[in-house]
Amino acid sequence: MAKEAARVRRRERKNITSGVAHVNSTFNNTMITITDAQGNAIAWSSAGAKGFKGSRKSTPFAAQIAAEDCAKKAQEHGMKSLEVEVCGPGSGRESALRALQAAGFMITSIRDVTPIPHNGCRPRKKRRV
């Protein structure tokens, strides 16, 4: 049995001028997803996807590189203005935001959507180094 030839999916260029950038910054990684107003993903990137491994994924520089890559992909679809939703306690929040602004996007609003418990689950123990 012969294998079927792998299909090459061409990405069609959408013409979307405004969208939402979701910056999810954890202690271990930073993920950036740019969506349209309905929430359909246009472009995404993360520090791990850009080749950073281990503890280097959680650095602000890795978040900046991931945000620049995601911005470049979104600009290919005609995106010009963004609302930014920042989530999580990580160190890449501000640097990802600065990288999106430096890429030429007009940032209309910045929202912090980090979930805060009303005394929910017990937190992790404090590290003793």
Swiss-Prot record:
Question: Which domain of life does the protein's organism represent?
Answer: Bacteria
Recorded GO CC terms: ribonucleoprotein complex; ribosome
UniProt entry tagged with the keyword Lipid biosynthesis: no
- Record bears the keyword Heme: no
Q: Which GO terms describe its molecular function?
A: rRNA binding; structural constituent of ribosome
Q: Please, one GO biological process term?
A: translation
Which keywords, in A-to-Z order, does the entry hold?
Answer: Ribonucleoprotein, Ribosomal protein, RNA-binding, rRNA-binding
Quote the InterPro entries the UniProt record gives: Ribosomal_uS11, Ribosomal_uS11_bac-type, Ribosomal_uS11_CS, Ribosomal_uS11_sf
- UniProt family annotation: Belongs to the universal ribosomal protein uS11 family.
* Complex and partners: Part of the 30S ribosomal subunit. Interacts with proteins S7 and S18. Binds to IF-3.
Q: What does this protein do?
A: Located on the platform of the 30S subunit, it bridges several disparate RNA helices of the 16S rRNA. Forms part of the Shine-Dalgarno cleft in the 70S ribosome.
Can you name this protein?
Small ribosomal subunit protein uS11
